Structure formats: structure tokens, C-alpha cells
Amino acid sequence: MSNTAAELFRSARLACWYSAWAAGACSLDDARDAVVGADAAHDVLGLRDEPVPLVLALGMLRATGAGVATLALPAPGDLTGLGGPPEFNADALEASEAVLLPSSGLGLVPTAVGAGVTWQVSPAHESHTVPDLVEADTALRETLLESSARLADLDVPRWRPEAAEGLQALRHPAGEPLPAGYGVRAQRAAALALRCLGLCDLALDDDGGAVSAWEAAERRDALGRLARAARHALVAACSAGVRAA
């Protein structure tokens, strides 16, 4: 597990390390440890009448024929990575994340319960909206340039110095947040996407320095576009599987 792996959404961790384990790129124990991270424990609902510990659930899911997992990070008006049915989409949208196992027709949605996490397994259709990695990576970099220029015009350093520092740090995103076996482009795209999402969360926290409602709306629009591009890039990277370019 890399130093930056804990920054991944829980569903991103599960999608990546499940795919890596299924491909033989990591051990079952390593996959379990990476997914659980700092949480107390992860249990899976819907495979048996009682909750199943994650380490056992991974094997049960593999037995269904699921070889690759894909990620969804839905937001209102953006269901990229989801394929239905509506009930699963609604649960994923409420959680803002989900894992799909296309070969088995199943999906998982996490819920934090105290210091632990439960995953609900439900029927889920394969998504045909998972972004292409090259296209999503390129789109993120183009959106970052555009958003940076717009935010600079809106005097970001004055209203949010931490955001200005974050923009500078985006020039050199560090670490490889995905498991070994994922390609260089996937690692690079995921690292940049995580930095961008962190920046957007910080900068959207308040409009304290906005001098007008128009300026505040412009900032939210620029950051919203960047967050959407970052989500798509992270979905593409985490869904690419091991040995992706």
C-alpha cells in the first residue's frame, strides 16, 4: 500500500485492489489490508444471511466470475460509471461512490458504521459510461489549465491562500496511489485527480473572499468543472485494471 493510497475513496480502494488481487498482482491479505486502511473492519452484506468479513467476501465474489472491478463516483446530474438498475444507481448516488463487478452482474456500495464499514451487494448492470483513460486524463489536464486561469483571474491567492498553494502543488502530484501493476498513465491520472479533488473540497468550503454573488458563482463553476473532470479521471484510472498503459 503506497503512502497516498489512504487518500482514495473506499470504493476506489476496493475496485483497484480487488482487480489487482484477481489478476495475481497482490496477495489476498495485502488486498484486504489496503481496502480496510484505517477503518476498524469491513463486512459485506448480501452474500449470505449474515455479514461476511471482507477477506472471505473477496473470495466469494471471485467465485462468481468477477475478474475486474470498476469504479463509479456519481454526483447529481453525473452518473458516469453506473449502468443501473435504478435502485442501485440511487444507492450509489446517495453514497457518492460504488464498485461494479461487470462479469458477475453485481455491485457494492459502502456505508460507514461507527469505525467500520459495511458493503451492500446488489444486482448491478455493467456500465458503458466508464471513461477512456487517455481521454479522461487529457480532459483533466485541459480542465485544470482552464480552471487555474479562471481562478487566477478571480484572485484565488487573496480569498483562499491554501487553495493557491494547492494549485501550485498540482504541478507535481506525488506518489502512486494505485496497486503495483497499474500502468504509469493510470497512476499519474489517479494522483492528479486526487490532488484536484482535495483542492476542490478545500476551495468550495466557503466563498469568504468573494466580492459578489457573480464572483462566487464563477468560482463554484470553475471548481465544479474541475471536480467533475477529476472524478472521471479517477474512475478511468481505477477501472483500467492492472498492466494498463
PLM region spans:
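Generic structural signal of hydrophobic/aromatic residues within well-ordered alpha-helices
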Residues: 31, 41, 57, 61, ...
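N-terminal intrinsically disordered, low-complexity regulatory tails that precede a folded domain
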Residues: 1-99
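Structured binding/interaction patches within domain cores
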Residues: 3, 7, 122, 161
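Internal, hydrophobic cores of structured domains that mediate oligomerization or house catalytic pockets
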Residues: 60-150
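Alpha-helical oligomerization segments
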Residues: 152-245
